[in-house]
């Protein structure tokens, strides 16, 4: 993503790169950029994965921009004049900037409308993002390249990260762009999809087996859309723990502290975006401590799909099948709350075999993934 060429790519005969305005509401005149970004994301997801299950919506962009105490975003758009003279977003880029940790780091994402690829738009967006990252004083950048299926090494060149887990086709446009700009493949994550409904009794059986393995020292709690006040601090501790334990290989991601205020800020952001969630957590009864949790997140205007988010078990309580327990109980709750959902998507690092094994046991199937590239801003 990062070379030192200083050619002027902010404008082109057919399109131009500009900062994305932040509207007060989605019906405001300035909302054209957020609506356009959402359409680019939708078309890009369909082109790569064949579905729009995980495509960012305009309301997601608005809600995240309204809640930036912990993560700030600098958004840019590539725009051309549409048939009616209105701006048409043909590509976009964003630099995600941690505000309470990782002051050295920017996570960068670029997407171009499929009909407008191979015109230099992606390179122009990358160059402008490089300038933004430098302006923000960040020294390291991470970028992901999505792919719909793991490549066949026997039939095409592939790249394998230093972890030795997973691979990505060397000829993918996102891979080529990352390498062109001096970034190195560090990690591959797997996207998995669980088709619903599960065979009758599946979640119940896994939950019963896990409860037996856990024993009487553990109590399960399930919450919808809001975590009770008395558990906020301990829930925040679990989120923090995930940032310590997640197997991120050599990605330069430092622990990211959570507290009760941050949890409530994300509650507010989810509510503003029209999202709901289910969290199942496990309490260690003798100590009164939360020691495991998992979350399912969903957009309420997308009844057919949900996302499996965070799952974490504290190190001292591993080996009791608590990861299986929280997921099984949460899936039972999800079946009651979201009976029309037909798919759950999730992402796991390929070097996390334990969590992948739990997902496979439930019936999650591989559905592509993402390759994470990293490098210095100066390339």
Each language-model region and where it sits:
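Acyl-donor-binding surface of acyltransferase catalytic domains
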Residues: 1-20, 127-230, 370-374
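Long, mid-chain structured domain cores
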Residues: 89-92, 99-101, 107-114, 122-149
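A conserved beta-turn-beta hairpin within the catalytic core of GNAT-like acetyltransferases
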Residues: 98-108, 117, 136-141, 299-309, ...
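A short, internal acetyl-CoA/4′-phosphopantetheine-binding micro-motif in the GNAT/acyltransferase core
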Residues: 109-117, 147, 283, 310-319
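Conserved acetyl-CoA-binding loop-helix of GNAT-fold acetyltransferases
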Residues: 118-134, 313, 319-332, 361
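Conserved N-terminal glycine/acidic-rich loop preference
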Residues: 292, 320, 326, 353-370, ...
């Amino acid at each position: 993503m990062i070379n030192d060429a200083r050619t002027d790519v902010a404008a082109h005969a057919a399109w131009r790169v500009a900062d994305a305005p932040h509207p007060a509401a989605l019906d405001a005149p300035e909302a054209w950029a957020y609506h356009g970004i959402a359409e680019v994301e939708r078309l890009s997801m369909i082109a790569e994965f064949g579905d729009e299950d995980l495509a960012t919506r305009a309301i997601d962009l608005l809600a995240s921009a309204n809640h930036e105490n912990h993560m700030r975003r600098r958004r840019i758009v590539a725009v051309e004049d549409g048939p009616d003279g209105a701006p048409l977003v043909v590509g976009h880029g964003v630099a995600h900037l941690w505000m309470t940790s990782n002051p050295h780091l920017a996570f960068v994402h670029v997407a171009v409308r499929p009909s407008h690829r191979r015109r230099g738009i992606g390179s122009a967006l990358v160059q402008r993002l490089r300038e933004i990252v430098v302006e923000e004083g960040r020294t390291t950048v991470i970028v992901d390249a999505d792919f719909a299926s793991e490549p066949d090494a026997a039939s095409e060149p592939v790249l394998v990260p230093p972890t030795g887990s997973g691979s990505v086709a060397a000829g993918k446009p996102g891979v080529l762009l990352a390498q062109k700009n001096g970034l190195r493949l560090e990690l591959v994550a797997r996207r998995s999809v669980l088709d619903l409904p599960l065979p009758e009794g599946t979640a119940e059986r896994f939950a019963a087996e896990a409860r037996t393995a856990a024993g009487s020292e553990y109590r399960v709690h399930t919450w919808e859309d809001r975590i009770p006040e008395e558990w906020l601090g301990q829930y925040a501790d679990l989120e923090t723990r995930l940032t310590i334990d997640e197997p991120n290989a050599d990605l330069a991601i430092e622990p990211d502290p959570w507290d009760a205020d941050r949890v409530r800020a994300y509650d507010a952001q989810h509510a503003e975006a029209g999202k709901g969630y289910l969290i199942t957590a496990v309490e260690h009864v003798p100590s009164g401590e939360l020691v495991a949790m998992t979350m399912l997140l969903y957009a309420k205007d997308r009844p057919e799909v949900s996302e499996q988010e965070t799952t974490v078990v504290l190190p001292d309580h591993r080996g009791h099948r608590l990861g299986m327990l929280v997921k099984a109980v949460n899936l039972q709750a999800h079946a009651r709350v979201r009976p029309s959902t037909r798919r759950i998507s999730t992402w796991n690092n390929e070097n996390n075999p334990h969590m992948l094994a739990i997902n496979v046991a439930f019936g999650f199937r591989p559905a592509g993934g993402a390759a994470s590239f990293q490098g210095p801003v100066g390339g």
